[in-house]
């Protein structure tokens, strides 16, 4: 049997839960509800009106709900144009007896009235709504104006009056007072409807939804022609709404044994006593709620490509864009690919990758096309999927529009089966791109690129097919999971062409990286970016003649990617064993053909290796102004070695870096990593190549790294362009050399003996004077000789 005090606690807890339930529901979607609330914050009533707010301060309301009533009254003031000639506001509180809190003529300032509302103190007591209405009928609005000014009474109550309210309500309405009722807590809607003016559904509101209540009140005032508060472009709409009244009923739940008395004094006997429980339920009242709805800046759906529009006030918005978009405020493509290439996407559709991963790859592919391409894009796109076999979904360029291309991708079906990436690479290299007839006058020489999307390790070998693809001048970019990074790096060859992700969401975040890589895949060298570049080749016995020839071939292939001339790229070459040899300096060759001939003349040396001496040779004999180095141009040194003999190279390498010269180290084979890392300075500048045979796969990687770093700002005084211990001084985007005992722009001319103690400015003036005297002497002697002639 449940004890009475337990029932009391449960009833209290139940009431606290029920207070969280909504007792008024507008049957609208969340977007419309937000628009109603936003309109409520924008509406302003600006006609002459007398408004009296009647606050229920009884015990049935309680202190908490009374504070919410005050909050509603304060928010209502924000929608009113308060002034002595416009809207005047007063307030009364009632419980057992009515009490004037402040008169309508006490303040004409919105801030002052809100402060007065804030200072109202809860009274407590019985709920005598009828008595408060009679007071207003007898004495009118306290501080009100003549009858010509419309009067509005706003009753904020839970509608649980302890007296008769029908007669006072009729009397109030007979005084031409328009009555609004605003429910608080769990209102008794029947009583609020009886108190309010007609139409009742437009004059009954709910205080807990402040913006909605203000909207409804202002809308009704507009419909009654008492004021015009609907903002421009907004409209009044009617919505179905449900109002709920919380009822409590007493129900017999059983009997229990109890002792009952009898007519005879002192006599009791056992019997059955009834046990009751209280059940709470809602009575529903269907109604129509009239609200003002204003257009939203997001109504026109300005955010493209799946972006989410977030309104910021009446006219502004911002878009939350999916990855790969965000080129402007409306989620337009972030990067429009304008390069001319044949692009083939090769998508893993095997059981190894799973159906879920296949769908993610499809979504990624669609997102990429939407974000990067348009019908005017010069790229030719194709799509293939593979497992045991390869299926061409769309051949290169065989579609009329991006919409048609996306439709083909939508129609892709999961194949299942084994994962044979090597077989697929060989197939698309042979048959995936358009072939040009042998006797055609026009050669289709567009760069060819395959973007491989797979997250798993292949069941067949990928090394041979990947090498075959690169030999056929097919570029490879890999998009894969972190777990498959090793095999994909072997496929693409160049680490910069590898795009990895750790989870499906991060896959979409890699869109910008893929966009960036695609159009830079065919970039040759540094294009118009000036660069002074020196190669340092290990020609020691440890390398051998055959491998040294591979190094020369690597330098040749890399050099082909640069525009060799005095204004763009200059290249120098140093070979070394125990001693270094400058094969040619930066200013030796001014054309590509001449440079290639110079590389071919580099000879194998043999002997032990000293990388440090070679770097000192670069510093003292190659990267100098007298040997063609250009001030204000980025400078880089590429050292190719297996690490032997590099123990003495750390200090010279740091000397180069301290003078603004980048040092890249290509370590081949089973390298001595620690010594080469000290030589490179950081992981960024160390490129590990598994073997001499693999060097060819790293040509693009080296070029791209050097060219990317060559975009960095340059210090004109590093390395020092001043010869013969001159001091370089920066000045306004240029520099000058402060020379001691030398003259010329770079201190290249020795000053004549006897002039060394003169200031530098006098050297040039004295020489000018000597040259002037010589010219005058020549002129005089010439005139004399002419006079001697017959």
From Swiss-Prot:
GO annotation, cellular component aspect: basement membrane; extracellular space
SMART domains: EGF (SM00181), EGF_CA (SM00179), VWA (SM00327)
Chief location of this protein within or outside the cell: secreted
Basic residues: compositionally biased ranges: 764-778
SUPFAM superfamilies in alphabetical order: EGF/Laminin, vWA-like
Membrane spanning stretches: none
Signal sequence, start to end: 1-22
Disulfide bonds listed in the record: 298-309, 303-319, 321-331, 717-728, 722-737, 739-747
Domain annotation VWFA: ranges: 50-221, 342-518, 532-702
Protein localization: Secreted
Subunit architecture: Forms monomers and multimers.
Protein name: von Willebrand factor A domain-containing protein 2
Organism: Xenopus laevis (African clawed frog)
Lineage: Eukaryota, Metazoa, Chordata, Craniata, Vertebrata
């Amino acid at each position: 049997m449940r004890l009475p005090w337990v029932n009391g606690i449960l009833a209290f807890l139940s009431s606290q839960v029920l207070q969280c339930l909504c007792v008024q529901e507008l049957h609208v979607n969340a977007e419309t509800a937000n628009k109603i609330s936003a309109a409520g914050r924008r509406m302003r009533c600006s006609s002459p009106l007398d408004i009296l707010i009647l606050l229920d301060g009884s015990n049935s309301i309680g202190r908490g709900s009374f504070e919410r009533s005050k909050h509603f009254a304060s928010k209502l003031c924000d929608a009113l144009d308060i002034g002595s000639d416009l809207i005047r506001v007063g307030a009364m509180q009632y419980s057992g007896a009515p009490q004037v809190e402040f008169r309508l003529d006490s303040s004409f300032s919105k801030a002052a009235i809100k402060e007065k509302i804030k200072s109202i103190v809860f009274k407590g007591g019985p709920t005598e709504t009828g008595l408060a209405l009679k007071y207003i009928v007898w004495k009118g609005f306290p501080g009100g104006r003549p009858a010509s000014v419309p009067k509005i009474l706003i009753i904020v109550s839970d509608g649980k009056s302890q007296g008769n309210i029908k007669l006072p309500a009729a009397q109030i309405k007979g005084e031409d007072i328009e009555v609004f009722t605003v429910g608080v807590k769990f209102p008794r809607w029947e009583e609020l409807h009886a108190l309010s003016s007609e139409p009742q559904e437009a004059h009954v509101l709910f205080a807990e939804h402040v913006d909605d209540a203000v909207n409804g009140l202002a809308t009704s005032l507009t419909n009654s022609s008492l004021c015009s508060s609907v903002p421009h472009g907004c409209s009044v709409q009617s919505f179905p709404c449900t109002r709920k009244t919380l009822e409590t009923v007493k129900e017999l739940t059983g009997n229990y044994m109890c002792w009952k008395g009898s007519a005879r004094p002192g006599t009791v006997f056992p019997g059955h006593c009834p046990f009751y429980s209280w059940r709470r339920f809602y009575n529903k009242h269907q109604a129509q709620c009239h609200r003002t709805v204003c257009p939203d800046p997001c109504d026109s759906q300005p955010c493209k490509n799946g972006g989410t529009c977030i309104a910021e006030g009446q006219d502004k918005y911002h878009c939350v864009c999916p990855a790969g978009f965000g080129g402007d405020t409306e989620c337009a493509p972030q990067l429009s690919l304008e390069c001319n290439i044949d692009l083939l996407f090769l998508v893993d559709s095997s059981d190894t990758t799973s159906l879920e991963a296949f769908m993610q790859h499809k979504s990624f592919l669609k997102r990429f096309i939407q974000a990067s391409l348009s019908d005017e894009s010069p790229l030719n796109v194709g799509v293939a999927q593979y497992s045991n076999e390869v299926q061409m979904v769309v051949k290169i360029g065989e579609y009329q529009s991006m919409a048609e291309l996306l439709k083909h991708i939508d129609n892709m079906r999961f194949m299942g089966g084994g994962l044979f990436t090597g077989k697929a690479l060989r197939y698309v290299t042979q048959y995936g791109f358009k072939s040009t007839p042998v006797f055609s006058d026009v050669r289709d020489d567009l760069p060819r690129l395959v973007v491989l999307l797979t997250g798993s390790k292949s069941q067949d070998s990928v090394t041979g097919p990947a090498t075959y693809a690169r030999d056929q001048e097919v570029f490879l970019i890999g998009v894969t999971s972190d777990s498959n990074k090793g095999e994909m790096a072997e496929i693409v060859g160049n680490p910069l062409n590898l795009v990895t992700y750790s989870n499906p969401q991060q896959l979409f975040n890699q869109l910008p990286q893929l966009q960036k890589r695609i159009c830079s895949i065919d970039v040759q060298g540094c294009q118009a970016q000036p660069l002074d570049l020196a190669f340092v080749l290990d020609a020691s016995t440890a390398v051998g003649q055959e491998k040294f020839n591979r190094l020369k071939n690597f330098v040749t292939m890399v050099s082909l990617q640069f525009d060799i001339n005095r204004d763009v790229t200059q290249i120098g070459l140093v070979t070394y064993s125990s001693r270094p040899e400058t094969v040619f300096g930066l200013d030796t060759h001014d054309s590509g053909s001449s440079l290639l001939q110079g590389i071919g003349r580099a000879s194998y040396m043999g002997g032990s290796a000293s990388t440090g001496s070679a770097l000192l040779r670069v510093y003292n004999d190659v990267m100098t102004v007298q040997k063609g180095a250009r001030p204000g141009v980025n400078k880089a040194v590429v050292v190719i070695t297996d690490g032997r003999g590099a123990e003495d190279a750390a200090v010279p390498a740091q000397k180069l870096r301290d003078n603004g010269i980048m040092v890249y180290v290509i370590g081949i084979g089973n390298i001595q990593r620690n010594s080469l890392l000290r030589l490179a300075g950081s992981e960024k500048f160390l490129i590990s190549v598994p073997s001499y045979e693999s060097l060819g796969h790293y040509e693009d990687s080296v070029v791209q790294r050097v060219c990317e770093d060559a975009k960095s700002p340059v210090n004109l005084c590093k390395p020092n362009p001043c010869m013969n211990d001159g001091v370089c001084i920066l000045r306004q985007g240029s520099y000058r050399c402060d020379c001691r005992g030398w003259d010329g722009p770079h201190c290249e001319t020795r000053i004549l003996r006897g002039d060394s103690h003169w200031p530098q400015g006098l050297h040039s003036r004295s020489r000018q004077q000597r040259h002037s005297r010589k010219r005058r002497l020549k002129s005089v002697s010439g005139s004399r000789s002419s006079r001697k002639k017959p």
